[in-house]
Amino acid sequence: MSKTAIIFPGQGAQKVGMAQDLFNNNDQATEILTSAANTLDFDILETMFTDEEGKLGETENTQPALLTHSSALLAALKNLNPDFTMGHSLGEYSSLVAADVLSFEDAVKIVRKRGQLMAQAFPTGVGSMAAVLGLDFDKVDEICKSLSSDDKIIEPANINCPGQIVVSGHKALIDELVEKGKSLGAKRVMPLAVSGPFHSSLMKVIEEDFSSYINQFEWRDAKFPVVQNVNAQGETDKEVIKSNMVKQLYSPVQFINSTEWLIDQGVDHFIEIGPGKVLSGLIKKINRDVKLTSIQTLEDVKGWNEND
């Protein structure tokens, strides 16, 4: 029997104008967008719609903006009935809202705080990330270990699809890998426009603060399994999920294993909810036989609601 997973993108998918088509054109989406505006301590709708101050790319703003867009799309969709959900990094919080582990209002506060802690963890220029293209995980892991020392580290951070592994760590080592990448066998090594060494062990510095912050909110058992980035399997227990969301800060995103786990459970239809088609592109490189649907806009929502 066919099974469906709803999936949510992470940072990098944001763009100016995001969710503007939903606002005032769909009551359910407008409710989420208005709730975000009323919950947060900055003008999130201005940042998402026009970004006149150029702040959308700052992680403490990007994170609530993406969660809000995905959640607004989700609220507007009818007859979804997913069997599983999965998000990439930040996108996992949209999964938690979808599976009713967190209320949207609590989730948007949590990702705002997550972004602030991540931004404050290191001074600008200390940590960074890069995408390594054309090498498998074992080779990238080996290169990272050879470059790392007692006082500087570089580690695999996002295991996205065959031939695309994102690494994270001290900027000096990221720069060295970018420079040496081709000689080490990579097709390309592309530096990413991020302000810190996300999903590396360096992020353990914020573990305690983040853990104590999220403990003040109500976490519920998931209504359907959330496939978690840190262990690539479906979880429903609220305490396991919460613990894994803390570990997620400093652990690699196991996207290949997560996708393969879902396919092993019988999932043959992935519905990506949020801006862009990044995850659909990754899944195509993991398995070409599954069906992929992208829901990015009001028109996509209307198409789904009319056809389903």
Curated annotation (Swiss-Prot):
The active site is at residues 89, 199. GO terms for biological process: fatty acid biosynthetic process. The keyword Ligase does not apply. SMART domains: PKS_AT (SM00827). The keyword Transmembrane helix does not apply. InterPro entries: Ac_transferase_dom_sf, Acyl_transferase_dom, Acyl_Trfase/lysoPLipase, Mal-CoA-ACP_Trans/PKS_FabD, Malonyl_CoA-ACP_transAc, Malonyl_CoA-ACP_transAc_FabD, Malonyl_transacylase_ACP-bd. GO terms for cellular component: cytosol. GO terms for molecular function: [acyl-carrier-protein] S-malonyltransferase activity. Keywords: Acyltransferase, Fatty acid biosynthesis, Fatty acid metabolism, Lipid biosynthesis, Lipid metabolism, Transferase. Gene3D superfamilies: Malonyl-CoA ACP transacylase, ACP-binding, Malonyl-Coenzyme A Acyl Carrier Protein, domain 2. It comes from the Bacteria. Disulfide bonds: none annotated. Its EC number is 2.3.1.39. It is an enzyme of class 2 (transferase). It catalyses: holo-[ACP] + malonyl-CoA = malonyl-[ACP] + CoA. Pathway: Lipid metabolism; fatty acid biosynthesis. Belongs to the FabD family. PANTHER family: MALONYL-COA-ACYL CARRIER PROTEIN TRANSACYLASE, MITOCHONDRIAL. NCBIfam families: fabD. This is Malonyl CoA-acyl carrier protein transacylase. It comes from Staphylococcus aureus (strain COL). The gene is fabD.
